[in-house]
């Protein structure tokens, strides 16, 4: 099983990529003086091929939130939402990252009536309809509330945040 955090909305969701992570070609990585796996240095491999190596200069910045579009129909499991637009949220809770997530939610709700934040264990036998659902006003949403959501072990949970 793997855990999927994602947002659902009937309004278009913006992507927000981790600015500290870069995808490099082997040549770019060599120019930076990075140690490269010998398989990638093989003569049969085109070292100019873009986006082969995932690079983050500071390992602590790797956990910065990465928010990108997903298609819920691409998942074998029912991921729970009936919302039209979805973005995956890759993150690890910390004092810094929770503020980024909180601001993302607040910004989205400037133009949308509500936003769902889901935590789903893919491969779970529990059905989304029976998962934990809570409603919260954006003015009441805090870092502590998001921390509780993050550490919860519920198979399916949805936090609906309204403006």
Predicted segments with their positions:
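Structured alpha/beta or helical-core interaction and ligand-binding surfaces enriched in interleaved
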Residues: 1-163
């Amino acid at each position: 099983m793997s855990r999927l955090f994602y947002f659902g909305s009937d309004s278009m969701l913006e992507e927000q990529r981790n600015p500290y992570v870069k995808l490099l070609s082997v040549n770019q990585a060599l120019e930076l003086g990075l140690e490269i796996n010998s398989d990638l240095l093989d003569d049969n491999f085109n070292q100019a091929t873009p986006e082969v190596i995932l690079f983050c200069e500071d390992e602590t910045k790797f956990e910065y939130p990465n928010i990108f579009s997903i298609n819920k129909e691409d998942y074998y499991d029912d991921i729970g939402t009936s919302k039209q637009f979805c973005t995956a949220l890759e993150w690890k809770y910390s004092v810094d990252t929770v503020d980024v997530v909180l601001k993302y939610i607040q910004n989205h709700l400037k133009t949308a009536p509500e936003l769902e934040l889901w935590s789903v264990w893919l491969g779970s036998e529990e059905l989304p309809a029976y998962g934990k659902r809570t409603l919260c006003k954006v003015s009441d949403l805090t870092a502590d509330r998001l921390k509780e959501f993050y550490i919860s072990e519920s198979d399916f949970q949805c936090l609906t945040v309204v403006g």
